[in-house]
Amino acid sequence: AAKKAQEKKEKEQRGEEVRAAHKEKLESMTEEERAKYEEEKMAVRARRKKEAEEAKAKKQAALTAPNGVVLDLEFGHLMQDKEMRSMAKQLTFCYSANTKAQVPVRLYLTGLGGRMGEITRQACSGFNNWAVICSEESYLEKLADRKKNIVYLTADSEHELEDFKEEDIYVIGGIVDRNRYKNLTLDKANEQGIRHARLPIQNHLKMTGTHVRVPPTLLHHQRT
């Protein structure tokens, strides 16, 4: 409590110093300089307001985008903390890529509970303000009425995805496993009776060892 009180006092003191310096600066200006200063300040405020409105509109666009992509985070029990932190970094990359995309997708983070949920919220900067749909439920629970539209993207599928369909929702396995679990996401899709497919990356990208490098627009497609 004492530490917080001291921090509050120091913050108030810094605020007073800034206000005093600002007042002194204004008083030292000529009337013409003051008018120009106020004009520039208003322009900055207008620009920031416009940027905030554009960011809000883009956030809304991402939440209502027709194409849905689910990041399945139900694999926390199969990962160590360092792997979950690595997964959190990949989530940040995916989210950043989506916010910069000309046509964003509607992102779902499902199975976001337990240790995976804790690490994600700690490691992902500004997570509470992300324009995503988060749930501790599985994607089958969250999207129970859309099961027929769910397609699990897994590199082990024998089916190649020919095109993206607006009515379908694509699931990507959120796991960093260093190839410990063969066919993990494929087996999961088969057990749940949902469709699965692999991205046609062999036709467009080079392989580096067992790592599949993909462009941000395809988010993350990992061998499991």
Explain the meaning of each model-derived region.
Residues 167-224:
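C-terminal folded domains that constitute the principal catalytic or ligand-binding module
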Residues 78-80, 115-118, 159-162, 178-181, ...:
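Eukaryotic short linear interaction motifs
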Residues 1-159:
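RNA substrate-binding interface of SAM-dependent RNA methyltransferases
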Residues 61-64, 99-101, 144-146, 162-165, ...:
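Intrinsically disordered, low-complexity regulatory regions enriched in Ser/Pro/Gly/Thr
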